[in-house]
């Protein structure tokens, strides 16, 4: 297989998923899950199943839980994501909630490197040598009762507090290209050691 053919294979959906899986597989496997039980599903399968939620265009982890045993979904999980056993909604949350988000950054870096070496990003140059990057924030979690030390805080006029997590997402785009390439998302949280809450108040009167 020539170099060009090898690069083309790596840049296919199957090739990029295989690359991501190889990186996820390098993450240390915890001896026990959050319940203190030895995991029966490898961490790499939990991560690839979570990635499949997006690839299979499922709206939530709960919908994934309801579809994971459907023959077509099982086939895609096996053939594309190489998942031998998909976790249920609860198991996936428990395993991934304990994972440091920074540990998955190498997967984004590796795919971006493949796109650079394969000259794919040349097709996304705009106004000369620039890349267009679209950014947006998204809410991940909000509660007035459940919170952690990294939660942002929104103090309301009635004295109540809303605790929330948000994330900044960014993708490389081009007006003439259908595909977009996500960059590693960045969690939005209080700075280390900060005790100052978010004072923006209610967004609507």
Question: Which residues are covered by each model-predicted region?
Answer:
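Active-site-proximal, Lys/Arg-enriched surface segment
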Residues: 93-177
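Short, motif-level signal for alpha-helix interfacial/capping segments enriched in acidic residues
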Residues: 64-68, 109-118, 199-205
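Gly/serine-rich nucleotide phosphate-binding loop at the start of the catalytic core
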Residues: 3, 12-87
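Electropositive, glycine- and tryptophan-enriched low-complexity nucleic-acid-binding patches
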Residues: 155-205
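Short, flexible active-site-proximal loops enriched in glycine and acidic residues
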Residues: 61-63, 74-87, 104-108, 122, ...
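Generic structural signal for well-ordered, non-membrane alpha-helical segments
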Residues: 40-42, 101-104, 108, 200-204
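Boundary/linker elements of alpha-helical solenoid repeat scaffolds
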Residues: 6-7
């Amino acid at each position: 297989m020539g170099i060009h053919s090898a690069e083309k294979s790596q840049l296919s959906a199957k090739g990029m998923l295989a690359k991501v899986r190889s990186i996820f597989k390098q993450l240390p496997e915890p001896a026990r899950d959050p319940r203190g039980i030895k995991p029966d599903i490898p961490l790499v399968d939990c991560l690839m199943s979570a990635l499949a939620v997006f690839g299979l265009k499922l709206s939530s982890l709960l919908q994934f839980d309801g579809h994971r045993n459907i023959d077509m979904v099982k086939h895609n999980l096996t053939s594309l994501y190489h998942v031998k056993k998909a976790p249920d909604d609860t198991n996936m949350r428990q395993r991934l909630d304990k994972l440091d988000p920074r540990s998955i950054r190498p997967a984004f870096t590796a795919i971006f490197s493949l796109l650079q070496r394969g000259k794919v990003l040349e097709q996304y140059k705009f106004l000369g040598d620039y890349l267009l990057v679209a950014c947006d924030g998204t809410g991940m979690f909000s509660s007035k009762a459940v919170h952690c030390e990294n939660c942002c805080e929104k103090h309301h006029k009635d004295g109540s507090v809303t605790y929330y997590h948000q994330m900044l997402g960014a993708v490389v785009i081009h007006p003439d290209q259908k595909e977009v390439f996500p960059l590693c998302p960045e969690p939005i949280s209080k700075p280390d050691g900060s005790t100052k809450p978010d004072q923006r108040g209610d967004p609507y009167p």
